[in-house]
Curated annotation (Swiss-Prot):
This is Tyrosine/DOPA decarboxylase 5. Roots. The keyword Magnesium does not apply. GO terms for biological process: amino acid metabolic process; carboxylic acid metabolic process. It catalyses: L-tyrosine + H(+) = tyramine + CO2; L-dopa + H(+) = dopamine + CO2; 5-hydroxy-L-tryptophan + H(+) = serotonin + CO2. Keywords: Decarboxylase, Lyase, Pyridoxal phosphate. Its EC number is 4.1.1.28, 4.1.1.25. The gene is TYDC5. CDD domains: DOPA_deC_like.
């Protein structure tokens, strides 16, 4: 029982393939590189996939029993897979946030996958651990993060700060929330977990709510504090203070605040310094989520957006968004790594070793949720070395400049308006109500609620019409009840001419949409 009979082994046919044959790897690898290079030459036309649900049903229902050639497989990729791909690297991709690729990022990923190490602790692959610590310090220095967030070679520094590469912001937030939870429960008793409260704005990424659920926070104790146009949808410190005081009055325990630099809907920026001042009065762990906009803060002119970060407990950004590093690569820095380790560490006998026992190495398995971990630092290292700080800043500034160009094009068309300030490289705009209703808004008896509903509806139709054309791809958000179209510049291949072309496409579809509008709603 529990073993395979030897007669079965003897009767098995011997496979003639070696899954890791160096010569075949070289041959097939060249084919893949050529395939992808050709893909990038031709990705300049379409952006969003026009496939319908179930489009992959043409593929076989079962796996092949015998091997197939790489030539056949690549042909199927061309015919069956690519038509169902939304082309995130297209220069005409302006949706969500960018997933900016680069040659260095791709090649770094290739090296990482090629070595295929599992660097859960230092002993399992020393170079993977030590390179990660180095690149996290490099990037932290580029951001001008305080030394309390960086690794120190000075044994007398007394700092337990440092950085770790997570998969996504969701993981980074979950890790820091778990660390703060355990730190607090060790003080007040684990039986009081239902008293813990998590704070954010109504613009904070949904990753925080998911993390709170996983960490066992009572859903009733999740505070999404309302924002408004008056603060450009940033979180008000006074609103935070009032909410905290009300919770304390109710016998609850403030635990965790997630402040955002560059919200998903509108790239709003929470005031880090003032929020930290409020939070620190109550011992609240402050995490700064700069998933999108953090990359821009390597440029001195954007660094002020994270002023006050020295008072926060943790900080993260996604290098796979706007830093030319392939998915997944979330950079997390913490001041107190001991809190992470205490909350997340495990020490089974089969992982014990002298290096870990010496306390002179980092075991990154204790800084994350999973045990296994990828060699993510390799691709970030290649990006930093291949382009250098000066070029990376130049790339980012070019995207901001293109967004300002788009902003200027909108300003010249009186039918449109900018809904929220253009802070980084995303423009949020909409068709004005006046453009939709032909100047009838000043008439008596106008139902302004109906006007806003109709305006939102028309802007939604405009977006869907543009996206259905396949020429460009944008997405939307709703802030303060206003439906707006998001134009996010950041694809590596995008040039100013693509932005100008996108605007022409938008204008053409606007002309068509406005020609069919029924403005009887104002009557």
């Amino acid at each position: 029982m529990g073993s395979l009979p030897t007669d079965n082994l003897e009767s098995m046919s011997i496979c003639s393939q070696n899954p890791l044959d160096p010569d075949e790897f070289r041959r097939q690898g060249h084919m893949i590189i050529d395939f992808l290079a050709d893909y990038y030459k031709n990705v300049k036309v379409s952006s969003r996939s026009q496939a319908n649900p179930g489009s992959q049903q043409t593929l076989p229902e079962t796996a092949p029993n015998h091997s197939e050639s790489i030539e056949t497989i690549l042909q199927d990729v061309q015919n069956d897979i690519i038509p169902g791909i939304t082309h995130w690297q297209s220069p005409n991709y302006f949706a969500y946030f960018p997933s900016s690729g680069s040659v260095a990022g791709f090649l770094g990923e290739m090296l990482s996958s090629g070595f295929n190490v599992v660097g859960f602790n230092w002993m399992s692959s020393p170079a993977a651990t030590e390179l990660e610590s180095i690149v996290m310090n490099w990037l932290g220095q580029m951001l001008n993060l305080p030394k309390s967030f960086l690794f120190s070679s000075d044994d007398n520094a007394g700092s337990s700060g440092g950085g770790v590469l997570q998969g996504t912001t969701c993981e980074a937030i979950l890790c820091t929330l778990t660390a703060s939870r355990d730190k607090m429960l060790n003080k007040i008793g684990r039986e009081n977990i239902n008293k813990l409260v998590v704070y954010a704005s109504d613009q904070t990424h949904c990753a925080l709510q998911k993390a709170a659920q996983i960490a066992g926070i009572n859903p009733k104790n999740f505070r999404a504090i309302a924002t408004s146009k008056a603060t450009d949808f940033g979180l008000s410190p006074q609103a935070l203070l009032s909410t905290i005081l009300a919770d304390i009055e109710s016998g609850l325990v403030p635990l965790f605040l997630c402040a955002t630099v560059g919200t998903t809907s509108s790239t709003a920026v929470d005031p880090i310094g003032p929020l930290c001042e409020v939070a620190k009065q109550f011992g609240i762990w402050v995490h700064v989520d700069a998933a999108y906009a953090g990359s821009a803060c390597i440029c001195p002119e954007f660094r002020h957006f994270i002023d006050g970060v020295e008072e926060a407990d943790s900080f993260s950004l996604n290098a796979h968004k706007w830093f030319f590093t392939t998915l997944d690569c979330c950079c997390l820095w913490v001041k107190d790594s001991n809190a992470l380790v205490k909350a997340l560490s495990t020490s089974p006998e089969y992982l014990k070793n002298k290096a870990t026992d010496s306390k002179q190495v980092i075991d990154y398995k204790d800084w994350q949720i999973a045990l296994s971990r990828r060699f993510r630092s390799m691709k970030l290292w290649l990006v930093l070395r291949s382009y250098g700080v000066a070029n990376l800043r130049s790339f980012l500034r070019s995207h901001v400049k293109m967004a300002k160009h788009f902003d200027g094009l909108i300003a010249m068309d009186k039918r449109f308006e900018i809904v929220v300030p253009n802070t980084f490289a995303m423009v949020c705009f909409r068709l004005k109500p006046a453009a939709i209703f032909n100047g009838k808004l000043g008439e008596n008896g106008v139902d302004y609620n109906c006007i806003e509903e109709k305006t939102n509806e028309i802007n939604s139709k405009l977006l869907e019409s543009v996206n259905a054309s396949g020429s460009i791809y944008m997405t939307h958000a709703v802030v303060g009840g206003v439906y707006m179209i998001r134009f996010a510049v950041g694809a590596t291949l995008t040039e100013e001419r693509h932005v100008s072309m996108a605007w022409k496409v938008i204008q053409e579809h606007t002309d068509a949409i406005l020609g069919t509008v029924d403005d009887s709603v104002v009557a």
